[in-house]
Amino acid sequence: MVQAPQKTITLDEFLQLAETKPASEYIKGAIVQKPMPQGKHSTIQGELITRINAAGKPQRIAWAFPELRCTFGGRSIVPDVAIFLWNRIPLDADGEIANTFNAHPDWTIEILSPAQSQTKVTNNILHCLNAGGQMG
């Protein structure tokens, strides 16, 4: 079977599109939809976020966000868990957490699901590290 080539779009065009469920990511001009999280994936994600935030939020060290869109370095990705150091959390004009995160996470966690490409997940982690992330 012959597949038609996918039309590439710009990052700005991608960001104007409606959000999808599960989330879609913009990688090298292409839209790649993440698989729908299953029970085990969601359990691991929830436990990680709960424990990281229990340690990091009270002391205002870091905050873990689930499925947060992070746009930086020509890509727009949605890590399973994105952890930002407190002083790097984007704020809006009212001093509240911004809706848009145009920065790399300090830590990125991807929970590999059976339907995911290990190469794609690894490349997203490397993209975060190359942009200045501390751990992935």
Where do the protein language model's features map onto the residues?
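Gly/Pro/Ser/Thr-rich low-complexity, intrinsically disordered segments predominantly at protein N-termini
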Residues: 1-135
